[in-house]
């Protein structure tokens, strides 16, 4: 089922998730290059959509991050994002061809829906997809 609307407070809750994802990536020593968050430049399009966070590891490997609220999971937009972001690979340099890690953060109560969507998209066993649960 594809949903279409967001609640009135979804912007604040989404920003909180983006902040938590940035914090987790920083703990993993990922340098945040761009983020849809105050103090950062907005990320550029990766495929059809802009992710919430783009970072880089010390080896130069890009990292893509996306925050999703429960009500945003079952949308065409999210399906396209997950497909696009999970299938990105490094284009040049010594890491050319290597899959770009894709980090997804969502509230803990959304975990079953997230796993169901990843299964629907045949992404549930991808090594480059990392799930963070908040709350």
Regions from the PLM with identified roles:
Residues 2-11, 27-59:
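Active-site metal-binding core of divalent-cation-utilizing nuclease and nuclease-like domains
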Residues 15-19, 76-89, 112-114:
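Well-ordered, non-membrane alpha-helical segments in soluble/globular domains
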Residues 53-79, 85-86:
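Conserved catalytic cores of phosphodiester-cleaving nucleases, focusing on short active-site segments
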Residues 87-99, 123:
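Arginine/glycine-rich "motif VI" loop of SF2 helicases in the C-terminal RecA-like domain
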Residues 100-135:
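Domain-level recognition of nuclease-like catalytic cores that cleave nucleotide substrates
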């Amino acid at each position: 089922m594809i949903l279409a609307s967001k609640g009135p407070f979804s912007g604040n809750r989404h920003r909180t998730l983006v902040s938590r994802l940035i914090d987790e990536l920083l703990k993993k020593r990922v340098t945040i290059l761009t983020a849809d968050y105050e103090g950062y430049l907005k990320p550029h399009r990766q495929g059809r959509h802009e992710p919430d966070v783009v970072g880089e590891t010390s080896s130069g490997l890009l990292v893509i991050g996306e925050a999703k609220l429960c009500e945003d999971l079952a949308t065409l937009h999210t399906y396209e994002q997950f497909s696009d972001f999970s299938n990105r690979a490094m284009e040049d340099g010594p890491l050319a061809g290597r899959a770009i890690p894709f980090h997804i953060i969502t509230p803990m109560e959304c975990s079953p829906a997230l796993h169901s969507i990843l299964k629907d998209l045949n992404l549930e066993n991808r090594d480059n997809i990392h799930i963070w649960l908040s709350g």
